[in-house]
From Swiss-Prot:
The protein, known as: Large ribosomal subunit protein uL3
Modifications the protein undergoes after translation, according to the UniProt entry: Methylated by PrmB.
UniProt cross-references to PANTHER family, sorted A to Z: 50S RIBOSOMAL PROTEIN L3 (PTHR11229), LARGE RIBOSOMAL SUBUNIT PROTEIN UL3C (PTHR11229:SF16)
Chain segments annotated as transmembrane: none
Lineage: Bacteria, Pseudomonadati, Pseudomonadota, Alphaproteobacteria, Rickettsiales
Organism: Rickettsia rickettsii (strain Sheila Smith)
Length: 215
């Protein structure tokens, strides 16, 4: 199991293949991605690499983290993330990870934070159909309706689908295919859409459920 990388979502575009089919692509940029530290089975109970991306002002880093970056002999990073790895896949601290960590035709899993939608109603948040448009219904056309039973149990159960904050959730999209890798511009072109807004950070790692590589 190899390490993943931290990338930045640039936006979307599309291309046409040899059959004239239009393929939607999401562009992600890999820049300044370095190994910050190691987690070992003997010391921490598991094997992992700590990856960092995007340089940060030293004045904005806490003293404990300053020592971490000083030990790694690299500049402070804005984003840090751990990736579990197998024992034979350790990479030297301060080593850089580039776009050629992946190849065209490979399948990857993307973990990102969805776009925040604020407080949303039940129809938008959970795809409820709403109440009737007429036949005695007034004001509450977009209401979720009843949320419980009667005096017993006398409460709304946890997890009940209701209106509330929507978005800003960490989600993983599995088995997305890499269309192409542009080493010169440090871009990875991934087929399909990826959660998150432009310039947001996401993690890219080898697909767990789809090992085969088809070009």
């Amino acid at each position: 199991m190899r390490t993943g990388i931290i990338a930045q979502k640039i936006g979307m575009t599309s291309v046409f293949n040899d059959k004239g089919e239009r393929i939607s692509l999401t562009l992600v940029k890999v820049d300044d991605c370095q190994v910050v530290g190691h987690k070992t089975l003997e010391k921490h109970g598991y094997n992992a690499l700590v990856i960092g991306v995007k340089d940060k002002k030293i004045s904005r880093v806490t003293k404990p983290m300053r020592q971490v970056f000083a030990n790694a002999k690299i500049s402070p990073k804005t984003k840090l993330k751990e990736f579990r790895i197998s024992e034979e896949n350790f990479i030297d601290i301060a080593a850089s990870l580039e776009v050629d960590h992946f190849t065209a035709g490979q399948f990857v899993d993307i973990t990102a934070t969805t776009i925040g939608k604020g407080f949303a109603g039940s129809m938008k948040r959970h795809n409820f159909r709403g109440l009737e448009a007429s036949h005695g219904v007034s004001i509450s056309h977009r209401s979720h309706g009843s949320t419980g039973q009667r005096q017993d149990p006398g409460k709304v159960f946890k997890g009940k689908k209701m209106a509330g904050h929507m978005g800003c959730n960490q989600v993983t999209i599995q088995n997305l295919k890499i269309f192409a890798v542009d080493k010169e511009r440090k871009l990875i072109m991934i087929q399909g859409s990826i959660p998150g807004h432009k310039n947001s950070y996401l993690s890219v790692k080898d697909a767990i459920k789809k090992i085969s590589i088809t070009v």
